[in-house]
Regions:
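Glycine-rich beta-strand-to-loop/alpha-helix junction loops that act as flexible
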Residues: 107-109
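Short glycine/serine/threonine-rich phosphate/pyrophosphate-binding segments
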Residues: 111-115, 218-221
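Short, Lys/Arg-enriched N-terminal segments with co-localized hydrophobic residues
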Residues: 1-5
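Conserved phosphate- and dinucleotide-binding cores of soluble alpha/beta proteins
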Residues: 7-10, 14-17, 27-29, 35, ...
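HTH-adjacent hinge/linker in prokaryotic transcriptional regulators
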Residues: 7-10, 14-28, 32-33, 39, ...
Length: 260
C-alpha cells in the first residue's frame, strides 16, 4: 500500500484486518505495510485501542479476546429493529430455497429469525441452536424440530460450546442457512468465536451452504472469521447492495439480490 493513496480510515481498517487475522501486529509491520512513520503507527494503534478494537502491547498490539468485546456486541433485541425491511426481503426469498422432506440447519441471528417465520413447508426437519428460531417454529407446530443445547448465550439466544459442537458434528443437513456480522474480502465473520465455530461446523456438514446477510454487513469486519466466501454456495442479500460489491463478490460465489 502506498501511504498517500489510502485514507486514514482505510489504514485503520487495514491494521484491524491484520491484527484480527494474525492475532498480533507490530509497529514496524504497520510502518512497512502502510508507509507511515513510527509515531503515526503508534498513534493509530492507540486510537484503535481507545475504541476497544484491539489491545496495546509493547511494540505493537494484539487482537481482543471475546470477553473484552462483550460490551460492543449488540443483543438480539437491539438487532431486531435494524434493517427490518431488508431482512424480511431476504427471508421471503430464502424461504423458496427450502424443499419438502429436507433436513435443514438454521443458525442464530435476527435475519434467520425472519427466515424461520417465512418457512411455509411443514414436511421438513429443522435443526437449530437458536432458541428464538426454535420458539418461532414451535409456534407453527412443526413436527420435526430439533433444538441443539449447550452453553446458552442470552445476548443472542444461541446455544454454543463443546456439547453443541458434538451434536452438530454427528448430523448431516441438506442445506444450512447461516448469517454473520461482517463480510470483507474473503472473510465471513461474527462477534462470538463460539457461535462462529458452530456455524462453521453446520456449513461443513451441509450439502448446500447459504449465507443470509443484508447490505449493511458487507465491507465490515468482526472479531472471528468462521468461513470463506468462496466456500459458500449462495449468498442471499437485499436489493440495496451496491452493484460494485455485487460484481466483486460474484467472482467468488453465487450472490442473489432479493426484490423489495
Amino acid at each position: 500500500f502506498g501511504g498517500g493513496s489510502m485514507l486514514k480510515q482505510e489504514k485503520l481498517d487495514t491494521i484491524l484486518e491484520i491484527v484480527n487475522t494474525k492475532g498480533t501486529i507490530t509497529v514496524k509491520e504497520i510502518m512497512n505495510r502502510l508507509d507511515i512513520s513510527d509515531m503515526t503507527a503508534r498513534r493509530y494503534l492507540q486510537e484503535l485501542a481507545d475504541k476497544d478494537l484491539l489491545v496495546r502491547v509493547h511494540g505493537g498490539a494484539e487482537k481482543l479476546r471475546t470477553g473484552s468485546l462483550l460490551n460492543n456486541e449488540r443483543s438480539n433485541v437491539e438487532k431486531q429493529g435494524l434493517q427490518t425491511a431488508e431482512k424480511q426481503e431476504i427471508a421471503r426469498f430464502a424461504g423458496h430455497m427450502v424443499e419438502e422432506r429436507e433436513t435443514i440447519f438454521i443458525g442464530p441471528g435476527t435475519t434467520l429469525e425472519f427466515f424461520a417465520r417465512e418457512l411455509s413447508i411443514d414436511n421438513i426437519r429443522v435443526v437449530t441452536n437458536s432458541l428464538p428460531v426454535f420458539l418461532i417454529l414451535n409456534e407453527r407446530k412443526l413436527t420435526d424440530l430439533i433444538l441443539i443445547g449447550g452453553n446458552y448465550r442470552s445476548i443472542t439466544g444461541a446455544f454454543v460450546g463443546t456439547l453443541t459442537l458434538q451434536d452438530i458434528a454427528s448430523l448431516q443437513f441438506s442445506k444450512a442457512f447461516v448469517s454473520c456480522n461482517g463480510i470483507k474480502d474473503q472473510a465471513i465473520a461474527t462477534f462470538s468465536e463460539d457461535e462462529g465455530e458452530s456455524q462453521k461446523l453446520a456449513l461443513e456438514n451441509a450439502n448446500k451452504k447459504y449465507l443470509l446477510a443484508d447490505h449493511s454487513k458487507f465491507d465490515k469486519f468482526d472479531f472471528f472469521t468462521f468461513y470463506n466466501i468462496s466456500d459458500i454456495d449462495t449468498i442471499i442479500t437485499d436489493s440495496k447492495l451496491s452493484d460494485q460489491t455485487l460484481l466483486s463478490l460474484s467472482k467468488q460465489t453465487k450472490i442473489i439480490k432479493s426484490k423489495p
